[in-house]
Amino acid sequence: MSARLPFVLRRLARPQHPGSPRRLPSLCRASSGRGSGCGGGEGLLGQQRLRDTQAGSSRGPGSPAPPARDSIVREVIQNSKEVLSLLQEKTPTFKPVLAIIQAGDDNLMQEVNQNLAEEAGLNITHICLPAESGEDEIIDEILKINEDSRVHGLALQIAETSFSNKILNALKPEKDVDGLTDVNLGKLVRGDAHECFISPVARAVIELLEKSGVSLDGKKILVIGAHGSLEATLQCLFQRKGSMTMSSQWKTPQLQGKLQEADIVVLGSPKPEEIPLSWIQPGTTVFNCSHDFLSGKAACISSGVHGISPIAEDVSLLAAALRIQNMVSSGRRWLREQQHRRWRLHCLKLQPLSPVPSDIEISRAQTPKAVEILAKEIGLLADEIEIYGKSKAKVRLSLLERLKDQADGKYVLVAGITPTPLGEGKSTVTIGLVQALTAHLNVNSFACLRQPSQGPTFGVKGGAAGGGYAQVIPMEEFNLHLTGDIHAITAANNLLAAAIDARILHENTQTDKALYNRLVPSVNGVREFSKIQLARLKRLGINKTDPSALTEEEMRKFARLDIDPSTITWQRVVDTNDRFLRKITIGQANTEKGCSRQAQFDIAVASEIMAVLALTDSLSDMKERLGRMVVASDRNGQPVTADDLGVTGALTVLMKDAIKPNLMQTLEGTPVFVHAGPFANIAHGNSSVLADKIALKLVGEGGFVVTEAGFGADIGMEKFFNIKCRASGLVPSVVVLVATVRALKMHGGGPSVTAGVPLRKEYTEENLQLVADGCCNLEKQIQIAQLFGVPVVVALNVFKTDTRAEIDLVCELAKRAGAFNAVPCYHWSIGGKGSVDLAWAVREAASKESRFQFLYDVQLPIVEKIRTIAQSVYGAKDIELSPEAQSKIDRYTEQGFGNLPICMAKTHLSLSHQPDKKGVPKGFILPISDVRASIGAGFIYPLVGTMSTMPGLPTRPCFYDIDLDTETEQVKGLF
């Protein structure tokens, strides 16, 4: 053992010269604590607290000199450094962080910790609290560190009297690098030393004895004045070395006799003055592990005592080094947890009934797992979720940074053939597939679904959580408010709408000077532009920041947006089907001074803000997209944006929580993200990019993320590939194309299918000819998917009226049409077990190389992109532009928006623009009646015919069946 180490400790214990610099204050920052803080004394030390200080401070007075090569401390630190270097070869940015919570003035070991950490390659965060900090204050700090995923270890440097059980067990065991918690101690006693952290102080005692050549077998060990985890750890470690261990307190009557018999003495607390050193026999090895000695406040007990081994003085420094070693082990465990692994998921058991009950009865019969348990099972940390009730949680975007080096899973899109008005079960197939993958094949999988609008829920469609034994639970929470994302969109959208009309009013009723003075007021004698106003000045080419420096022309240019009311495209929204809001007149009150105009309401999910939410990939990206949204043109034909109105920051504030995906679960306890639900006709109709990206990281390599596209493949899938995949950069592995015998019969010439009207006998009896004729639509949709180079698996969603012959016929014809595979699915009636064949088919298809490609180059002219979609996807002969559509195309091209992708808005009930044309219409001319732009979302949307953005209520809406049991508060009637 290097002789320098005891010298270092004695040097640290020596009072600092008054004239020498005190370096610790420079490492601290202000604390709200009372009295003296770290280091005691007066001034800055008494009022400050240090956070996030890297272990890189230069050595100064009191710093330990580098130990000799043969030093055990050097060996420990060098070993830690080498292990960390190996970890960093795979994860170069990884650097473990040790947090030290200090209450009081025990500073003398701080520089030792700093320099050892620096040498090993760690960072240290030092948190200084006032000396008089109570139990609750210390625990508050512990809990913060527990949930901070950037910190990998936590040590306490507090008064010995403060080490209460409550404080010790507030520590997260996996961050307890001092081995203080009951969990770590219990694992040690049980023999699981490799799974726990062991007290560095106790380990230091054992290491020093063994390195000095002392055999512990048969030795008598006396531990005096120790208690708690240190006493238990010392006893456990010594006993495993074959030693006879005794514990005693200082006031024990037989203490002198025990001391004289002991070969090794370990002091756990300061020696009382009345106990003479002569009681300790010459040649006895004494270790002082008392709190005061380890913190450098007291000298070693062996000072001046002949025959007591000097190695006892080295406990403190070696303990600090072993803490660093524990830190590296903690970091290694943390990295291992970040790596892809199969989830240890507790799946929920199903007991399917026949006949199958209603969706809400099935949902209510299954008790979901607590969402925090689900989150932990799939690898989410406690600080990465925000819990809403018992079964919902938002997931923070910080997860993407933590898992940025993890490989993505496979990306699967569920699309469909041209549907009947009843829908063909894409959501049900999506949920059935992930239940099969995870609950039955033990494969990590995630479903990513759109959030349904309350309008259709209370109108004609009912719930959208899947159906039968393949649904999201609790389905009433899924279908109603969820976590309020749509309400946030409504608030943000209508704030922007109000800002537009208010700005027109104020510009119409004020002079240039008055308008400018109100936009840039003097506050407490100071006049300055806001951040967003400075951005507008820059866009206008006005390079001035002093409001008083603008010329009259510049003030006018800045203050007046000069919006042309006839060009306003931004409408108010509400999440209710209300046909009487399709055309309204606003501004009729006398207070609006004649600024009335015709306007309309849209359904909330038709708002461009919903499309922005679905396509954004970060908070900053969302803010930029919101600012770019074009709401109108000025009288010179230039676009007016949310940024011009100065409302971008406020919109972002309203949307800051909505951007976080919502975590729920399926009936079998597998994870689901429910996030964003843009209108599938005027927008792209897919769930959010962020939900997909987070899910792909969570499932890891070998896992699957399954998402769905709205309507048929000709609409939803085409938009998914050309719009969503461009925005996300993600490449799909497989398309699952959902078909039903019912829909195929309709395309084969069967009678019309109408919601709310019983099906004709053609749909409930076997009819192979209708099925065969209708497979032309299935073949066309397979061909559309193949345009993008993605393999197709056909999922035949089986109904109870389908016959074996019909099922076999569809699967055979699908394979002939080029599908990779085609399988019948029974998830609706028996859950994930009924989609196991589909899961195997998807896994096999995903193992093949995807040759994904976009349908068109966005740099093509707008007209050519529209024509490409019409001819290649819909099968049209050509397109026909109305004069208004041509005018809009010319305007958008002139404004610089011609390079955006296309989002076609047309009926979903036919490949053509005519809903009654089933099968595969050919030779038609696709009429483009209008062209609009969602610049913030990032696409141009041509309107094919007329397209309503506000649904209406039918004669008998779904709300007739919806009720609440006022005794149990259970929702009834949500299908």
From Swiss-Prot:
CDD domains documented for this protein: FTHFS, NAD_bind_m-THF_DH_Cyclohyd_like
UniProt biased composition (Gly residues): 34-44
Catalytic activity, EC: 6.3.4.3
Compartment annotation: Mitochondrion
Region called Disordered, residue ranges: 13-45
Main localisation: mitochondrion
Region named Methylenetetrahydrofolate dehydrogenase and cyclohydrolase: 31-345
Residues carrying Phosphoserine: S354
Residues that coordinate or bind ATP: T420, P421, L422, G423, E424, G425, K426, S427
PTM annotation (N6-succinyllysine): residues: K187, K593
Pathway: One-carbon metabolism; tetrahydrofolate interconversion
Catalysis performed (reactions): (6S)-5,6,7,8-tetrahydrofolate + formate + ATP = (6R)-10-formyltetrahydrofolate + ADP + phosphate
Assembly notes: Homodimer.
Recorded family membership: In the N-terminal section; belongs to the tetrahydrofolate dehydrogenase/cyclohydrolase family. In the C-terminal section; belongs to the formate--tetrahydrofolate ligase family.
PANTHER family linked to this entry: C-1-TETRAHYDROFOLATE SYNTHASE, CYTOPLASMIC-RELATED (PTHR48099), MONOFUNCTIONAL C1-TETRAHYDROFOLATE SYNTHASE, MITOCHONDRIAL (PTHR48099:SF12)
Protein name according to UniProt: Monofunctional C1-tetrahydrofolate synthase, mitochondrial
Source species of the chain: Bos taurus
Lineage of source species: Eukaryota, Metazoa, Chordata, Craniata, Vertebrata
Gene: MTHFD1L
